[in-house]
Design a protein with these regions (language model features):
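Short, flexible helix-loop junctions that flank or precede catalytic/ligand sites
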Residues: 1-347
Length: 347
């Protein structure tokens, strides 16, 4: 089987990831579980050859020098794939994550209605957070698509690597990938402010300088979408502030309290019928009360403010989990595994 056939099999079986690992058969992750494909183990030369087949010369050079690489590529008519190629003690390995060629709309994702409002904010910072594989990219792509279909403007994305490819609809869209199109998130963000964007998507707020530039862009009148690997709104605020040295923390809290629009923290759970996964969200809207808590570093009080903020579209993760259990979409056990207060989900 060549890599194209393996990827076609992976997509057909609705796998999120294809794992190629020297010494083992190919494996796919379906609805969160890793399963073996009924094929003989791959040798190092097999995996190495498959990886090289989908790389260009520049990527091969990086892989040889750095021993690992992130990149994306497409098979026309099938899907795009985000690839991490690396080495382990048995030899070459790679993980190929499927990026569907069709960008799902917010409606198709059954996303809360307020996500559409976040997508059309004229300025400010909207963060989508959660662990790896929680669907952050899918949610953000749907929000960017909503903006693209409803407003006239310029959307600039900075990604590592480019995942969903957007067509320009009402908006002009320019997508830049770290590596081929820019040397770093920081360089691209500095340039972005001179590229007349209305909206900037930053693939990952991974260090102090990127966070500083994203905050600055949001403060100067741009809509900025970004992701972090945090599991709640409170942890997101703490993570951003903690990156900065002590003498800057107060200034960062002030900037964040003025520019933040919303934090969506999401996780994916198996559906009760076992046929797929569903996203559960904590949603924090930057109301005057929330802005005040950020400014005054009263992050511990944020959870109760979200709990009582349903009138403006806020919800805690546990409130959303309760609703999903009540609607028979997920089991009590699945809710318990993700809940902040598992004791509220007996059985």
């Amino acid at each position: 089987m060549d890599i194209s056939e393996l990827l076609a099999f992976s997509v057909k079986n609705k796998a999120s990831d294809l794992h190629l690992s020297a010494g083992l058969p190919p494996m796919i992750r379906v609805h969160g579980d890793v399963r073996r494909i009924n094929l003989p183990p791959l040798e190092h030369k097999d995996v190495h050859g498959m990886i090289y087949d989908i790389m260009n010369d520049g990527q091969r050079k990086v892989y040889e020098e750095m021993l690992e690489i992130d990149f994306s590529f497409a098979i026309p008519g099938l899907a795009r794939f985000r690839v991490n190629a690396y080495n382990q003690e048995r030899g070459a390995s790679a993980v190929l994550r499927t990026i569907p060629s069709k960008i799902l709309s917010l409606e198709e994702l059954n996303a809360p209605k307020i996500f559409a409002e976040f997508a059309l904010k004229p300025r400010g910072l909207v963060l989508v957070t959660g662990p790896t594989g929680s669907g952050k990219s899918t949610t953000l792509a749907a929000m960017v698509n909503h903006l693209n279909e409803n407003e006239y403007g310029h959307i600039l994305t900075i990604e590592d690597p480019i995942e969903f490819v957007h067509e320009s609809k009402k908006c002009l869209i320019n997508q830049r990938e770290v590596g081929p199109h820019t040397l770093s998130f920081n360089n691209a963000l500095r340039s972005a402010l001179r590229e007349d964007p209305d909206c900037i998507l930053v693939g990952e707020l991974r260090d102090l300088e990127t966070i500083r530039l994203a905050l600055s862009a949001a403060e100067t009148g741009h809509l900025v979408f970004g992701t972090l690997h945090t599991s709640s709104a409170a942890k997101t605020i703490d993570r951003i502030v903690d990156v900065f040295p002590a003498d800057e923390k107060e200034m960062v809290r002030a900037m964040l309290s003025e520019s933040l629009q919303a934090v969506i923290s999401q996780t994916l759970l198996k559906t009760k019928d076992g046929t797929g996964r569903v996203a559960a969200h904590e949603i924090m809207v930057a109301t005057p009360a929330i802005r005040n808590l950020i400014r005054e570093a009263k992050i511990a009080q944020m959870y109760s403010a979200i709990q009582t903020g349903s009138g403006v579209g806020m919800q805690t993760l546990d409130q959303n989990l309760t609703d999903l259990v009540r609607r028979n979409i997920i089991s009590g056990a699945a809710a318990r595994s993700a809940a902040k207060s598992p004791e509220n989900f007996p059985g």
